[in-house]
């Protein structure tokens, strides 16, 4: 990604690439996308009227990166200050919402958006949280819209974070046969492996991770695939 903007002196001197790339499916192809960010407070101060001019799109198969210049620059971003800060902008609009994160994506036409899942407490005893909706923010205009989980547009790829998916499966794997069994005996208790990956199927991003026994985690006993937009999970035995 850095190479893609390296030849653009006016860009590389004022902005840096957000290293937290988002895995997306763009017209059926696996891609990674990241916005540019201001390289510090003074870079923001000097460029705040111009905004952020574009983003970087990486082909995950060919390992080729392209810089995409926008017709309308990005105003609201994580590296912005004061009223240009994305989190501050969302807090003003949704003061009671609990945001899980802010994920940069583009739709099928290449228009940029931040996907911002909202959370609610589901398990009081354990302090568990789960996604209950999504706010989609246009970072160029600041326009935001809140969606319930069954209303999320098809082009959105990431509503459920991989870490949250692993946590949710571990709740299921440990507690399916009861809380007492999860502490004493741990019969049939399962947990996910320490890492996860992404796969694009039918223009959706799926998160996959291995599953092991709590008692013996030396080998996988199966794996689980979860749709990162809908949360639909499928378990496969090995």
Which residues does each predicted region cover?
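Soluble extracytoplasmic regions of secretory-pathway and membrane proteins
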Residues: 1-238
